[in-house]
């Protein structure tokens, strides 16, 4: 009895570590999101060629977040980051109606990869502060999320510059990755 109580306490109070891969088309807001979570402020960004990686501490969880560039020429490199990924954050520019089909294609291509079969999916419908932004329901439809039968997924409306919705997304990740782990 004492040993199981000790194990329970260890689970409750030990820091969990989670490997998160954040991808999406170029200019969706991935790097802005990463540094808003890490530093709590808006940083000036340039297009990411390669990746940024940061550890974000939140609610007794240490998220290692890999922010990988989204330009079309470097998207084939995404697969090099798939191994051991527990959670996938797919960032969508909710204002970019012209490329939401391209975003859908890239998302589904990734989700078909064997190395990501156990990863949960969090979609950040970003740039909700813009007047023509599609809402989360419209993004869900355009990305074909309801067709993902074997995948645990969630969509969160966000605004990277204000931070709105970002921590709600991390809450969902922490609750859903830990229940799968």
Curated annotation (Swiss-Prot):
Pfam families per record? Arf (PF00025)
Which reactions is this enzyme annotated as catalysing?
Answer: GTP + H2O = GDP + phosphate + H(+)
Could you tell me which NCBIfam families the record lists for this protein?
A: small_GTP
Compartmental location: Golgi apparatus
Q: Does the keyword rRNA-binding apply?
A: no
- UniProt: GTP binding residues: 24-31, 67-71, 126-129
Q: Which InterPro entries match?
A: Arf1-5-like, P-loop_NTPase, Small_GTP-bd, Small_GTPase_ARF, Small_GTPase_ARF/SAR
Q: Give the enzyme's main class according to its UniProt record, as a single word.
A: hydrolase
EC assignment: the record states 3.6.5.2
**Hydrolase listed as a keyword:** yes
The protein's UniProt keywords, in alphabetical order, are: ER-Golgi transport, Golgi apparatus, GTP-binding, Hydrolase, Lipoprotein, Myristate, Nucleotide-binding, Protein transport, Transport
Protein name, per record = ADP-ribosylation factor 1
Q: Name one GO cellular component term.
A: Golgi apparatus
Q: What is the tissue specificity?
A: Strongly expressed in the leaves, young stems, roots and flowers of both male and female plants.
Q: Where are the transmembrane segments?
A: none
Give the residues annotated as coiled coil.
none
């Amino acid at each position: 009895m004492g040993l199981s109580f000790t194990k329970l306490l260890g689970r409750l109070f030990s820091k969990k570590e989670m490997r998160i891969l954040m991808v999406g088309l170029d200019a969706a807001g991935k790097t802005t999101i990463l540094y808003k979570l890490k530093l709590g402020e808006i940083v000036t960004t340039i297009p990411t060629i390669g990746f940024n990686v940061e550890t974000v501490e939140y609610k007794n969880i240490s998220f290692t977040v890999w922010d990988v560039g989204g330009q079309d020429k470097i998207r084939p490199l995404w697969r090099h980051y798939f191994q051991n990924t527990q959670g996938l954050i797919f960032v969508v520019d909710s204002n970019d109606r012209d490329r939401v089909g391209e975003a859908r294609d890239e998302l589904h291509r990734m989700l078909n990869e064997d190395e990501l079969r156990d990863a949960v999916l969090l979609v950040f419908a970003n740039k909700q502060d813009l007047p023509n932004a599609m809402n989360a329901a419209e993004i869900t439809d355009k990305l074909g999320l309801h067709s993902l039968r074997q995948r645990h997924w969630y969509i969160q409306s966000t605004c990277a510059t204000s931070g709105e919705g970002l921590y709600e997304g991390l809450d969902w990740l922490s609750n859903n990755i830990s229940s799968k782990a």
